[in-house]
From Swiss-Prot:
Disulfide bonds join C39-C52, C47-C68, C70-C79. The lineage of its organism: Eukaryota, Metazoa, Ecdysozoa, Arthropoda, Hexapoda. It comes from the Eukaryota. Ant peptide with probable defensive activity which acts as a potent agonist of the mammalian epidermal growth factor receptor (EGFR). Mimics, both structurally and functionally, vertebrate epidermal growth factor (EGF) peptide hormones. In vivo, intraplantar injection in mice causes long-lasting (several days) hypersensitivity of the injected paw to both mechanical and thermal stimuli. Its long-lasting effect is unusual for venom toxins whose effects are usually immediate. Transmembrane segments: none annotated. This is OMEGA-ectatommitoxin(02)-Rm1c. Residues 43-80 form the EGF-like domain. Gene3D superfamilies: Laminin (2.10.25.10). Keywords: Disulfide bond, EGF-like domain, Neurotoxin, Secreted, Signal, Toxin. One of its GO terms (molecular function) is toxin activity.
Amino acid sequence: MKDSYISIVIAYLMVTFILVSSMPIEGEKGELGPHRLPCPPGYENYCFNGKCVHVVAQDEPGKPCYSCICDEFYIGERCGTLDLTNPGYFLKG
């Protein structure tokens, strides 16, 4: 009984992971969503390899929160690191 419960939980987690990982990233299709706005002028180069967004929900008084939506194969706070662990990078033609 315990083994079947564990198998069901593992199957559920795997299906959830597959469904979530296949969802488009918010902002990927030109839609930033209700809590994200384009960054103001002057922040065009804030993200090294990505797009700057103003995350309104994370703002503190007098301190706006800016974040990056990284280009494919880039990771990090400002998209400055090439993710060589992504096998798709080596298959890119």
